[in-house]
Amino acid sequence: MKEMAGTLVRGICGQVEGSVIPGMLGMEAGQSAFGDVYAWFKQLLMWPLVDSRLAGGSEHDALVDGISDRLMDRLMVEAGERPVGSSRVLALDWLNGRRTPDADQKLRGAIIGLSLGVDAPDIFKSLVEATAFGAKAIAERFMLEGVPVKEVIALGGVPRKAPYITQTLADVLGIPVKVAASEQTCALGAAMFAATAGGIYVDVSKAQQAMGCGFDMEFRPRPENSKRYVELYELYHRLSGFMESMKER
């Protein structure tokens, strides 16, 4: 907390001394939608099958489940093979409003640059990039307020199941993204605090050293992609400003 003395980060959701670990400062920030953005797009593509009035029964349900399971994998493969900026499609990730920085739930998302040559993987790629740009906007706010962001630790389903998305995040942020090895990080963290409170370890740091599982994946930014994403991020900011100006219309 000494490094943060007198610093109050504007536009985040919370900043409390000792809220996470005693003697340290906890700062809360996040996006209103990340994985939900991909789920929304998947639902759009699946709608003709899921909502079909012409089919039903176990065979139809099995077909829907099979396509649903493979759809996202196929989208990620196709999107990952396409160069950054190749489609000129740009998206804004405010499909559920904006949480950080500067919360405003009245804001809405956008997709621009569409043409008859754009396909589903192009749009999906733009949505993945948009969620990464949203994360960069948060990191940028911290850095502008004097809080360095040197690396990101990712946990949960998306980082483990979707390496394309996590690699894009590293490319956009320009810093390494480590993926926690544990699939139950929240439960593991609770167990660490319980072990400390029960006197098994003298502090949370010791519990982390003894009980932590470390990381099993690390994604490092690819210089060429990162350079291109700097340019696209500026366009993302311009689109953000336009959508903010349209909020009340």
Feature locations, PLM:
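Glycine/Thr-rich phosphate-binding loops that ligate phosphate moieties of nucleotide
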Residues: 2-249
